[in-house]
C-alpha cells in the first residue's frame, strides 16, 4: 500500500514534461511493435481529450464571471494590448506564409476526390456566424463548447455580480478555485492520455500518406517554426525589452507540446490557465485573454490558409503579384480569426481565400482534401503554435504593463 502511495506521489509531484516525453516514446514503441495493441489503448487518449473538453467550458465561464465580479475598482486588465498582439501576430503569420510560399513555391497533385464539406461563402458569413454565436443560449454554449458565447455570458454575469454582496462574490471565487483544482488533476493525467493519442495516431496513420506531400508540409512547418522561434520572440522583445526566449521556450514546452497532441485549442485552455497561474500572471487578465486567444489568436491557421491557397494558385498557373499577396494576408488574417466559428477550422476557410484568385470551389475543395491528408501533422503544429502563443502574448503584455507601472512609481 505504501509503495502504491509512493508511486502516486511521485507521479503527482514529478516533472510533467518528462512524464509526457516518456508517454510519447512509449506510444511510438507500442505502435511500432503491435498495431492492435496501439489501437486498444487509443481510448486513453480519447478519455484525456474528452475530460479536457468537458471541463474547459465550465472553467472559462466560472473563471471569467468570478474574476470580473471580484475585480477591484479601477483595476487594469491589459486586454487592449493583448488583443492588439493577437491580431498583429495573426497578420504577421500570414505575411510570413506569403514570403515562404514565394521563396519555396509549391504545387499540388490534385485528385478528383474532394472532401465533403460546406465551406463559408464569404467573410460576411464568417462574421454572421460569430455574431450569432455571441448571443447563443448560455446552456447551449456550455454544452457545445461555444467559447464566444461562453465569454459573452461570463462577462455579462461578472458585470452583473460586480455590485453584489461580498459573500456572493466569495461563493464564485470558491467555485472558481474548486474547478481549477479539478483541472490540475486532469492535467496530471496528460502523460497517460498522450501515450494513448500517440499510439493510435502512429498505428492508424503512420507517415506513408504524408510522404507524397513532404514539400508542402516542410513549407508549412518551416513557416510555423519561423513564427514560433523568430517572429514571436521579436514581438515579445519589443514589449518586455529583455531576452524573450526563456518565456517562449517555457510556453512551447508546457503549452505547445500538449496542444500538439490534443490538436484542440479548446481542450488546451485548462493547460494554458494553469501555466498562466504558474507564471504568476493576473487572473483578471488571463481568465479572459486565454479563452479569447483560443478564438481570435490564429497565427497557425493564417499560415495554413495562406500557404495552401498559394499552392493552389501555383498549381492552376495563376500569377500572384505582391499587392494580391498582401490582400491575401489580410483576408487570411481576418478569416483565421473566425476559424473557431467554422466547423472544420482553417482548412474549410481555404475556398474563401481561393476565391481571390478566381479558383473554382471544386478545385479549392480538392486542396482542402490535401489538407486533411497532411492534417495529422499540420493540424497538430498549427494548434501547438496557436495555443502556446496565447500564453506568450498574455505574459508579455502583463510584464510590459508591470514594468511601466514600476517605472512610473
Swiss-Prot record:
Its source organism is Shewanella woodyi (strain ATCC 51908 / MS32)
Question: What are the UniProt keywords, alphabetically?
Answer: Amino-acid transport, Cell inner membrane, Cell membrane, Membrane, Symport, Transmembrane, Transmembrane helix, Transport
Protein name per UniProt = Serine/threonine transporter SstT
UniProt xrefs under InterPro entries: Na-dicarboxylate_symporter, Na:dicarbo_symporter_sf, Ser_Thr_transp_SstT
Biological role: Involved in the import of serine and threonine into the cell, with the concomitant import of sodium (symport system).
Its family?
A: Belongs to the dicarboxylate/amino acid:cation symporter (DAACS) (TC 2.A.23) family.
**What sections of the protein cross the membrane?**
14-34, 48-68, 82-102, 141-161, 192-212, 216-236, 290-310, 322-342, 357-377
Its main subcellular localisation, reduced to a broad class, is membrane
The way this protein sits in the membrane is described as: Multi-pass membrane protein
Q: What does the entry give for GO biological process?
A: serine transport; threonine transport
Highest rank taxon of the organism: Bacteria
The UniProt catalytic activity note for this protein reads: L-serine(in) + Na(+)(in) = L-serine(out) + Na(+)(out); L-threonine(in) + Na(+)(in) = L-threonine(out) + Na(+)(out)
Amino acid at each position: 500500500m505504501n509503495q502504491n502511495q509512493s508511486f502516486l506521489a511521485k507521479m503527482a509531484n514529478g516533472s510533467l514534461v518528462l512524464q509526457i516525453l516518456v508517454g510519447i516514446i512509449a506510444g511510438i514503441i507500442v505502435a511500432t511493435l503491435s498495431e492492435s495493441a496501439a489501437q486498444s489503448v487509443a481510448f486513453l487518449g480519447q478519455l484525456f481529450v474528452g475530460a479536457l473538453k468537458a471541463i474547459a467550458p465550465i472553467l472559462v465561464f466560472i473563471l471569467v464571471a468570478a474574476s470580473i465580479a471580484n475585480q477591484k475598482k479601477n483595476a487594469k486588465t491589459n486586454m487592449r494590448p493583448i488583443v492588439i498582439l493577437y491580431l498583429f501576430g495573426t497578420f504577421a503569420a500570414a505575411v510570413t506564409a506569403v514570403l515562404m510560399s514565394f521563396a519555396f513555391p509549391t504545387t499540388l497533385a490534385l485528385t478528383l476526390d474532394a472532401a465533403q464539406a460546406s465551406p463559408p461563402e464569404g467573410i460576411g458569413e464568417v462574421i454572421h456566424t460569430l455574431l450569432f454565436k455571441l448571443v447563443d443560449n448560455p446552456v447551449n454554449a456550455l454544452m457545445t463548447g461555444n467559447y464566444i458565447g461562453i465569454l459573452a455570458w461570463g462577462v455579462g454575469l461578472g458585470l452583473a455580480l460586480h455590485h453584489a454582496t461580498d459573500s456572493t462574490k466569495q461563493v464564485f471565487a470558491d467555485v472558481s478555485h474548486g474547478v481549477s483544482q479539478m483541472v490540475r488533476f486532469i492535467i496530471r493525467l496528460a502523460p497517460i492520455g498522450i501515450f494513448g493519442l500517440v499510439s493510435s495516431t502512429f498505428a492508424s496513420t503512420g507517415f506513408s500518406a504524408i510522404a507524397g506531400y513532404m514539400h508542402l508540409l516542410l513549407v508549412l512547418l518551416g513557416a510555423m517554426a519561423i513564427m514560433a522561434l523568430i517572429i514571436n520572440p521579436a514581438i515579445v522583445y519589443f514589449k518586455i525589452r529583455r531576452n524573450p526566449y526563456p518565456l517562449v521556450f517555457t510556453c512551447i514546452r508546457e503549452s505547445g507540446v500538449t496542444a500538439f497532441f490534443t490538436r484542440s485549442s479548446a481542450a488546451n485552455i485548462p493547460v494554458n490557465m494553469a501555466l498562466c497561474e504558474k507564471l504568476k500572471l493576473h487572473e483578471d487578465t488571463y481568465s479572459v485573454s486565454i479563452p479569447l486567444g483560443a478564438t481570435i489568436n490564429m497565427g497557425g491557421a493564417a499560415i495554413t490558409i495562406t500557404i495552401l491557397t498559394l499552392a493552389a494558385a501555383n498549381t492552376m498557373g495563376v500569377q500572384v503579384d505582391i499587392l494580391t499577396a498582401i490582400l491575401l494576408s489580410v483576408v487570411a488574417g481576418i478569416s483565421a480569426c473566425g476559424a473557431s466559428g467554422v466547423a472544420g477550422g482553417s482548412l474549410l476557410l481555404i475556398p474563401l481565400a481561393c476565391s481571390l484568385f478566381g479558383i473554382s470551389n471544386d478545385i479549392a475543395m480538392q486542396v482542402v482534401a490535401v489538407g486533411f491528408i497532411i492534417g495529422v501533422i499540420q493540424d497538430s503544429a498549427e494548434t501547438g503554435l496557436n495555443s502556446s502563443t496565447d500564453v506568450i502574448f498574455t505574459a508579455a503584455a502583463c510584464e510590459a504593463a508591470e514594468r511601466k507601472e514600476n517605472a512610473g512609481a
